[in-house]
Amino acid sequence: TSTSHPQPAMIYDYYGFPEEAYQVTYPAPGCPELAARIAGLLGGEGIPYSVDTERGFDHGLFIPLMLMYPRADIPALQISLLRGLDARAHLALGHALSGLMSENILVIGSGFSFHNMRAFDWSGRETPDARNDEFQEWLIRVCTESEQHLARWEAAPAARYCHPREEHLLPLHVCAGMAQQPAELVFNDYILGKRAVAFLWS
């Protein structure tokens, strides 16, 4: 499913944060035309797809875009993950969208390479964590050399420690499926005390 409202509202799909976190606005326009085009691309590959003309933007979109385009002057839409959270299905989803790679469209796999809420250090201290390091090193190797191994990400070292649930990792699979080529490592640092990495496909 993708958003398709021409002026999406805000969805604050997080809990327990300061009041200011629920006053954020990002008034970027939607992009119904692209949503319809994506529907055609996915339908052509037999991937069930629908557009949601009511849903607004959640933090997976407005947080990164606020940093990149603070004036909210670009049209945007969101695509949801597939039910079942199957890694191969998300690689296939990306592959079905690969025709968009040659156009002036920015695709952000908005997630996190480490997402174990209980393991974060909310003070931000960088503490040694061998399991975290093992998984990040595996992810670097796979994304910069042989992205097809993402299909078996659960077999990676400390996979379920770093991702008790995979919804913050699977956006990476969609991007890798679109590009089908090695990525460039563009971020390798600490967030909330845990090492995290990010990649660019161009």
Kindly label every feature range from the protein language model.
Residues 1-49:
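A short aromatic-anchored loop/beta-hairpin motif
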Residues 7-12, 69, 143-146:
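Short hydrophobic/aromatic-rich motifs at helix boundaries and adjacent loops
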Residues 13-18, 69-78, 149-151:
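Short, basic/glycine-rich phosphate-binding loops at helix/coil junctions
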Residues 21-29, 80-87, 159:
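Flexible, glycine/proline-enriched loop segments at strand-loop-helix junctions
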Residues 40, 44, 74-75, 85, ...:
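Surface-exposed, charge/polar-rich loops and edge strands
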Residues 80, 97, 110:
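Catalytic beta-strand/loop module used to bind and position nucleotide/cofactor moieties
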